[in-house]
A protein has these predicted regions:
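Transmembrane alpha-helical segments and their boundary/interface "anchor" motifs
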Residues: 12-15, 39-46, 53-115, 186-195, ...
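Interfacial loop-to-helix transition and helix-capping segments at the boundaries
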Residues: 30-42, 93-107, 144-169, 201-228, ...
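Aromatic-anchored segments of alpha-helical transmembrane domains
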Residues: 17-25, 79-88, 132-147, 191-207, ...
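Membrane-anchoring hydrophobic segments
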Residues: 4-7, 14, 26, 30-35, ...
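Alpha-helical transmembrane segments of polytopic integral membrane proteins
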Residues: 17, 47-50, 111, 170, ...
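Hydrophobic alpha-helical segments with transmembrane-like composition
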Residues: 45-46, 52-55, 83-178
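Membrane-interface helix-boundary motifs at transmembrane edges
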Residues: 2-5, 57-67, 117-129, 152, ...
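Alpha-helical transmembrane segments and terminal signal-anchor/GPI-anchor hydrophobic tails
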Residues: 161-164, 178-284
Length: 285
């Protein structure tokens, strides 16, 4: 087994924070647009999942897939029980299995199946697989008839297709285990530039005749993930990671990504909006 990359722990922490922020719109009384980052956070987490997936032993498919189930579904079942007891949620077993963890869990369980067979038979052709997936996603998005206000990162199944690219990207970089040198100024500017370009292109979703152009967001989003990964593997971030309290917090948040994703929307309340922005700190805590 290859050595664990601690940058992934840091990256998962970032992913958890931005995904959580994207669901906090009721906590921004006058600045709802700041409740953003969901697409970036999802891309980061799919990247992290792909990065670590091939580092462990694979073995027979049924045993390997059971290990994936055992890592995810105990938390899903636990939250289903707590949600029923504390918040009055009503879930039957079919609903829990199919959507109890939200779209993300259902999606990643499907990705696991695809990635197992890709690892088994196409490991040497990951770049080709990545290219084919991108071409298929782009072709499908261009050809399908979508509403004029269609959001490719919003509700619906289309995002299940294109987020697979980020999991493949993570798998490729996880296997390579290449050392990246982070340049604070230039790589920092590239990261900021990718984020700015992503949101600029993402704005096309609100312009009916240019709605299809939002698929170009994949390019800066891939860049955002890459430079975030470089940042998290920088010497500075590794020093921060090894600080006792900060490092413990990063490990805790990164290790509880799934749990945070499941419970967050049930805990958010607008009853403290009068003390904005301190209500955000309370909710994050």
């Amino acid at each position: 087994m290859k050595q664990r990359n601690i940058g992934i722990d840091i990256l998962k922490c970032f992913a958890a924070i931005v995904i959580t922020n994207s669901h906090m719109d009721i906590l921004y009384p006058k600045f709802g647009a700041l409740a953003t980052g969901g697409a970036i956070g999802d891309a980061l987490f799919f990247f992290c999942s792909g990065f670590t997936l091939f580092l462990g032993r694979m073995g027979r498919f049924d045993n390997w897939y059971k290990r994936r189930i055992n890592r995810i579904y105990p938390t899903v079942f636990a939250w289903a029980i707590l949600g029923s007891l504390l918040f009055g949620y009503h879930n039957d077993i079919n609903n829990i299995l199919l959507s109890g963890g939200g779209w993300f869990v259902s999606c990643i369980m499907l990705y696991y199946v695809l990635l197992y067979f890709i690892q088994r038979y196409l490991l040497e052709y990951l770049k080709l697989v990545f290219t084919i997936v991108m071409i298929i996603c782009a072709s499908y998005f261009v050809l399908i008839d979508t509403p004029m206000d269609f959001n490719m990162y919003g509700v619906g199944y289309f995002k299940w297709f294109h987020f697979f690219m980020f999991m493949l990207m993570g798998a490729m970089m996880g296997i390579a285990q290449r050392e990246y040198r982070y340049h604070f100024v230039w790589d920092g500017l590239k990261l900021i530039g990718c984020v700015v370009v992503f949101y600029a292109l993402y704005a096309f979703k609100d312009i009916a005749i240019y709605n299809k152009f939002q698929m170009l967001t994949w390019i800066p989003l891939l860049g955002t993930v890459f430079y975030f990964f470089k940042l998290c593997n920088s010497d500075f971030m590794k020093k921060v990671y090894h600080q006792r309290i900060v490092g413990w917090t990063i490990k805790l948040v990164g290790g509880l990504c799934l749990e945070i994703y499941l419970v967050q929307t049930s805990l958010f309340t607008d009853k403290m909006n009068a003390i904005f922005p301190f209500n955000l700190i309370v909710m994050f805590a």
